Amino acid sequence: MAMDRIEVKGARAHNLKNIDVTIPRDQLVVVTGLSGSGKSSLAFDTIYAEGQRRYVESLSAYARQFLGQMDKPDVDAIEGLSPAISIDQKTTSRNPRSTVGTVTEIYDYLRLLYARVGKPHCPEHGIEITSQTIEQMVDRILEYPERTKLQVLAPIVSGRKGAHVKVLEQIRKQGYVRVRIDGEMAELSDDIELEKNKKHSIEVVIDRIVVKEGVAARLSDSLETALRLGEGRVMIDVIGEEELMFSEHHACPHCGFSIGELEPRLFSFNSPFGACPTCDGLGMKLEVDADLVIPNQDLSLKENAVAPWTPISSQYYPQLLEAVCTHYGIDMDVPVKDLPKHQLDKVLYGSGDDLIYFRYENDFGQIREGEIQFEGVLRNIERRYKETGSDFIREQMEQYMSQKSCPTCKGYRLKKEALAVLIDGRHIGKITELSVADALAFFKDLTLSEKDMQIANLILREIVERLSFLDKVGLDYLTLSRAAGTLSGGEAQRIRLATQIGSRLSGVLYILDEPSIGLHQRDNDRLISALKNMRDLGNTLIVVEHDEDTMMAADYLIDIGPGAGIHGGQVISAGTPEEVMEDPNSLTGSYLSGKKFIPLPPERRKPDGRYIEIKGASENNLKKVNAKFPLGTFTAVTGVSGSGKSTLVNEILHKALAQKLHKAKAKPGSHKEIKGLDHLDKVIDIDQAPIGRTPRSNPATYTGVFDDIRDVFAQTNEAKVRGYKKGRFSFNVKGGRCEACRGDGIIKIEMHFLPDVYVPCEVCHGKRYNRETLEVTYKGKSISDVLDMTVEDALSFFENIPKIKRKLQTLYDVGLGYITLGQPATTLSGGEAQRVKLASELHKRSTGRTLYILDEPTTGLHVDDIARLLVVLQRLVDNGDTVLVIEHNLDIIKTADYIVDLGPEGGAGGGTIVASGTPEEITEVEESYTGRYLKPVIERDKTRMKSLLKAKETATS
C-alpha cells in the first residue's frame, strides 16, 4: 500500500538530537523554529539529502560522477520518501549570460517563435524582406487598372562611385537602347559621361508595357530578362505614380541586405550565430570611465588626482604627466575641476599628432629621453588592460572601467540580422525589455495571419503559460532581460518555483527555504496559493518558513527548538497551526496566538534636523526621486517587490557614501547629488554574505576576539618559560599548529563515485595544534578547548578579562550564545553570519557618525530572533548612530522611527516615493500598500499592550 506519511527515525544531522518525525504526505508542511534550531538540518540535510541520494543511487556510476556527491545523512531510517527537489536560495547563477528569460526557458520559446513566424525587415529601409517568384510579381503588377503605363527596369549599378564606362559599353553590346541614370532617361547611342567622384544609380530599360488583357506572358518574359541582368532584382516604374522593387532572393531590393534562413540559434546571444560581434552577446562593454580615473575632482594633478597613475614604485607615469603638463602649460597645482576642458582633454585623451619632449630618469639613475606621442590616460589604461598577460594588472585596470551599454547592439545582445526580424513591429530584444505583466498582455492580444497562427499556436501557449506562472508567484514586475545575478534570493527562488509549477509533476517531494523573502505582504497571498496549487497536484511540500501567514496556511506545522544550536534540535510541537497555538511549550505557538508579541516602542525618536538627502535618483526604475533620511534614527525603506528599494539604498546611497567616505571604487547609480555627508564619517553594509569562504574562518577570528584570546595564552607563565609568542597559538601559520593536517583538524580523503570522506587528523585528533602548544593551559583549558566552547561558556570562562568579555557579550546579545568560537564560517546560516557582523560592530566604540545599512535583516529569523535583533539595532541608534533597513517584515517596520515607502507598484509602475514619515503617518496614506497592511498590525498591538497593562494592574492590585 502507498504510505500516507514520511517517517524519519533517529535524525542526528548537525544539532538534531536523535529525533523521530512524522510528516503527512501530499500536504503543505511548514517547519519553523529559532534561527539555528535545526530546521534546515531536518528539511535539507536529512530529508532532501536522503530523497535525492536514493534517486541518484539508481543511476549508473558513470552518470553519478557528473552529479556531485551526495552524503548519506546521519539518520537511522526514513520511510515513505519520494524523489526530492530542493528550491533554495543558494543556487542562483551569477553568470552574466543568464537572464530571467533564459532561466525560465521563456526565451527558448521566443527564439523558436521568431524563427518560425518572424518577418525579416531591412534595418535601413524598413521594408519587409521577402523573396518572390515571377508569378507573384506578375500578379502584383496586373493589379493596376487597365491602360496603366509602366517600364520594366533592371538595376545594374546602385549608389556606386565611378564613370561606369565598361558597364555602359557592355549593355550597349547586348543590344539595349535606353537606360535611366540617376532618375533621368538617356539613350545608349548618346555619349554618356558620368562624374567619377559622385555616386550613381543605373537601370536598364528592358521593356515598356501597358496593362491590358493578354500582356502576362510578355510581362513574365521581360521580368525574367530583367532579373537575370539585375542579379535577382527588378524595378517597375509605374509612369507618373510609384516605383516597385522586387527581389527573387531573400534580400532588400534597395540595398541588398539579406538574412539567411531563420533558425532559433540566430536569436541566441550565447551562440556565435546570433551574438552581437562587438560585445559577444553580453549587451555591455567594459570601457575606461573618466569618473573612476579622476574620482576626486577637488585634487590637483600634483596631488595625484589621476588615480591609476598614483606613484607606487616607479616614477614613470608621474614624470610623463609632468612632461605633458609642461608642454601644454597645464597648471598642476589647480584642482582638476578648475582646469579648462581642452587642457584636461589632452591629459585624458592624448596629444594626437603633437610630439612631446619626455625625459625619464629611473630609480637607478638611468636616463631615457626623446620626442614621443602621448596616448592619453584613458587609452593607456585600455591598452594595458588588453595587452597584459598578468591577471593582477588586468584587475588593477578593471577598477577604472565600468560597464557601458554596447554601442553596436544598444544593449540588446544580438547582431543586427537578428534584430531585423519583427513580430507585430517589435524585435525580440524589445519583447525581453517588457515586464512579465506587459509581455503577458502582448502575447494574449497578438494577432497573426491564419497560416502563422497555425504554426505559432503551440509555442504561444507555452509562452503565455510560463509568463502567467511568473505572474502568479508575484514576479510580474521583472523584465525578461533582467540578469539572473541581480535577483534577490527570494526572487530567484520564486522563479524556480514558477518553473516547477510549469512542469506539473505529481508525487514529488518539494523542499523550499523561505520563499517569502523579499516579498511584500501584498503579494504573500499569491505565493501561498501557488504553493497550495503545487500541493493539489499531488505533491508534498516541506517549507522552512517564519512568515505568519504561511504558517497559518499550512496543513501541518512542525516547531523545532526549544533554543538554537546545542539548545535546539528537538521537535517541540507538531500538528495543525491551531494545535501548535494551544501548546504551552511552543515558542512559535505563543507568538501565533498573541500570548507573546513584539511591542510597539513607547515613543518614536524625532528627527534632530540632521539628514542625508539624495537628489534626482534615476537608476533602473527610479523616477528622479528626492529622498531624505533622518540621521540618528531607526529608518525603514519599504515598498512592494521591485519598487526600487535596493536600487535607492544599495546602488546609490551606499555606493555614493562608500566612494566619498572610504574612497571605494564602485560607481554609484545615477543621481544628481547627495547632501549631508558632513554628518557621517563611515557607512557599513551588514549583509548576509558568509563571513569567510573557508572553514579556517570562524566567529572568533572574524570578531577579533581570537587575537585577544591568543594574547591571554601568550601571557601565561608556561608560554613565557617556553618563549611562545601569540603567533604560536594560531592554527593558520607554522609553529604551533599540527603540520599533519595544517591546522584544519580534519583530513579530506577523495573518493570517486562516493562522497569525499573527512576523517579527524590521527596526529592531533582534531585539535588543530601540536602537543607542545596544547600543553600551555589557562585555567586548565588549552587553546583548542577554548575554540570548542560555546559563546555562553566562554563568557563565564573569560569574565575577568574585560576586553574579551565585551566582544563575547555582544555575540551573546545578538542571540548567538549557542555557537562555538571555532565553528567554521561555512556552516553558519545567512542570519547567523549577519549577526556575527552586527556583533563585531557593536563592540566598537561609537562615534555617532556611522550609517549602518541592512538589506532584509530578518531573513532566516524567527519572531523571537527578530525581537532580539531589534534590541541590538535600537542599541546602535541609542549610541547616536543611524540604522537604515530595507524590510518587508511588519514587526520591524512598526518599530521604526521613520519610514520611506517606495512604489506604488513594482518595476515600471514603481520608482517614486509614495509616503514618508512615522509608521502612524504611513497608515493614513491611501496609496501606500505598506500602510494598508501596517494599520491592522499597529491597532492589534495597541490593543494587546492595553490588555497586558490591565493584566499587570490586576495582578499588582
Swiss-Prot record:
Spans traversing the lipid bilayer: none
CDD domains named among the record's database cross-references: ABC_UvrA_I, ABC_UvrA_II
Keyword terms: ATP-binding, Cytoplasm, DNA damage, DNA excision, DNA repair, DNA-binding, Excision nuclease, Metal-binding, Nucleotide-binding, Repeat, SOS response, Zinc, Zinc-finger
One GO term of the biological process aspect: nucleotide-excision repair
Gene Ontology molecular functions: ATP binding; ATP hydrolysis activity; DNA binding; excinuclease ABC activity; zinc ion binding
Gene Ontology CC terms, in alphabetical order: cytoplasm; excinuclease repair complex
Pfam families xrefs: UvrA_DNA-bind, UvrA_inter
All copies of domain ABC transporter, residue ranges: 309-587, 607-935
Subcellular location: Cytoplasm
Zn finger (C4-type) location: 252-279, 738-764
Binding site for ATP: 33-40, 639-646
HAMAP family: UvrA
Annotated family: Belongs to the ABC transporter superfamily. UvrA family.
Function according to Swiss-Prot or TrEMBL: The UvrABC repair system catalyzes the recognition and processing of DNA lesions. UvrA is an ATPase and a DNA-binding protein. A damage recognition complex composed of 2 UvrA and 2 UvrB subunits scans DNA for abnormalities. When the presence of a lesion has been verified by UvrB, the UvrA molecules dissociate.
Record note on quaternary structure: Forms a heterotetramer with UvrB during the search for lesions.
Protein name according to UniProt: UvrABC system protein A
